[in-house]
């Protein structure tokens, strides 16, 4: 990804916005990408004392979206406005998050299809996550049963498709209603849909693998009660 530095945020940390980016900003329960921005043209491409024309790289430690701008928090001095940079996403971290995010959608689909129980919340890190569901109580033998069902779904290698629907159509789709598409702000007129074909369909803005087998393996680490009608699963992807 090659982009031009467009703005700089003032504050405790150095953050820059670009005219385009391939970095995923924290949102929808998925953490941000990491990586580097390398100055390749313009002010700062080579500093005094550098070897001839040496490029300067800045480590990206956080990515946040505010309004229309995506802010990349970096270590080091921000390049001048108009500087051209190359962005390199940490693919190992990104792919682990893709696998994890898809696994969470598989889990939601399996639990709905088997028990008709909706998800109430969740959070993820690379290859680990927690998900909360409206169980009260958890069924007997739930952890081993859901682990088996999710791994079977992974092995079936369901294809994953991404599409965009007008909001007026999305809010009438039964699967999207179940996954609370109506909670998306009304200012969003086009809804991005991630469909694990034949298993689960959700409005979602995150990153995913191309088919379920790419996820790997799924393991339930722990179940917890977070109160009446709210049970938590902690899981790992291998």
Task: Give the label of every model feature segment.
Residues 1-238:
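Active-/binding-site microenvironments in catalytic and ligand-binding cores
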């Amino acid at each position: 990804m090659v982009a031009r530095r467009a703005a700089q945020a003032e504050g405790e940390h150095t953050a820059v916005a670009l005219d385009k980016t391939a970095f995923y900003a924290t949102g929808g329960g998925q953490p941000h990408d990491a990586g580097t921005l390398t100055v390749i043209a313009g002010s700062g491409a080579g500093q005094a004392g550098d070897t001839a024309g040496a490029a300067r790289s800045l480590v990206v430690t956080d990515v946040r979206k505010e309004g229309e701008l995506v802010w990349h928090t970096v270590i080091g001095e921000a390049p001048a406005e108009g500087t051209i940079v190359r962005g390199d996403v940490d693919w190992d971290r990104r792919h682990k998050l893709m696998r994890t995010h898809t696994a969470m959608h598989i889990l939601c689909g399996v639990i709905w299809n088997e028990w008709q129980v909706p998800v109430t919340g969740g959070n993820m890190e690379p290859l680990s996550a927690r998900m909360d569901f409206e169980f009260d109580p958890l069924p007997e033998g739930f952890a081993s049963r859901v682990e088996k069902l999710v791994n079977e779904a992974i092995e079936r290698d369901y294809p994953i498709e991404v599409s965009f629907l007008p909001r007026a159509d999305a809010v009438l789709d039964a699967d999207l209603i179940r996954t609370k598409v109506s909670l998306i702000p009304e200012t969003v007129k086009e809804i991005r849909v991630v469909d694990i074909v034949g298993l689960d369909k959700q409005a979602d803005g995150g990153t995913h693998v191309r088919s379920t087998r790419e996820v790997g393996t799924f393991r339930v680490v722990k179940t917890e009660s977070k109160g009446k009608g709210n049970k938590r699963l902690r899981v790992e992807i291998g």
